[in-house]
């Protein structure tokens, strides 16, 4: 999910964080986790690369963020199925926490992240994110129009540790604790 702001917010209480002047959108939380080793401790390239933060299909005002269903489908199969009640920090808390030190201005978007059980996707996949009351956002995964340059900077990597971390493993135990594929079921049905 994404919260957007029609007026500035700074140093506000949690209870007032999502009062008037806030709107909501469905948001897909993509990441290019091949850059986790490149940006160790940072998510700049992992989450900030072009096209990784699609939002839509429209803007909803007066929407209550509490206890709403969130589902992610990949090629029509549910991969994530949760509610906002299961979020570690709800959107009210996230807005108030960020606004302690960063002034949120009109047009800013704050993303809540994704439910547990992230899954890798490949070119050709169709990813749909549904948020109760906000609608469905559909994304077609494609190869980017420009290859990543190899003559400058650290290059993307892929390893079991990177994949484990991307799917919810503990960063501080990378390379120490062997990743267990049993902890990361590939579908919602497998975890039940």
Regions found by a protein language model. Name each.
Residues 12-24:
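N-terminal accessory regions of nucleic-acid-interacting proteins
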Residues 33-192:
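Catalytic-pocket segment enriched in acidic/His residues
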Residues 1-7, 25-30, 59, 74:
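Short, structured patches in soluble enzyme cores that scaffold and shape functional sites
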């Amino acid at each position: 999910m994404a919260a957007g702001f029609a007026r500035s917010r700074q140093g506000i209480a949690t209870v007032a964080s999502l009062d008037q002047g806030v709107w909501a959108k469905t948001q897909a939380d993509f990441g290019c986790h091949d850059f986790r080793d490149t940006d160790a401790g940072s998510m700049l390239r992992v989450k900030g690369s072009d096209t990784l933060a699609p939002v839509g299909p429209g803007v909803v005002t007066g929407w209550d963020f509490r206890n709403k269903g969130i589902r992610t489908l990949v090629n029509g199969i549910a991969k994530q199925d949760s509610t906002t009640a299961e979020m570690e920090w709800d959107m009210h808390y996230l807005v108030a926490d960020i606004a302690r030190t960063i002034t949120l201005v009109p047009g800013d978007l704050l993303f809540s992240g994704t439910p547990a059980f992230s899954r890798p996707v490949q070119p050709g996949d169709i990813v749909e994110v549904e948020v109760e009351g906000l609608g469905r956002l559909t994304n077609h995964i494609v190869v980017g129009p420009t290859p990543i340059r190899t003559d400058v900077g650290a290059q993307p990597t892929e390893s079991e540790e990177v994949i484990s971390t991307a799917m919810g493993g503990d960063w501080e135990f990378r390379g120490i604790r062997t990743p267990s594929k049993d902890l990361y079921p590939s579908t919602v049905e497998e975890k039940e």
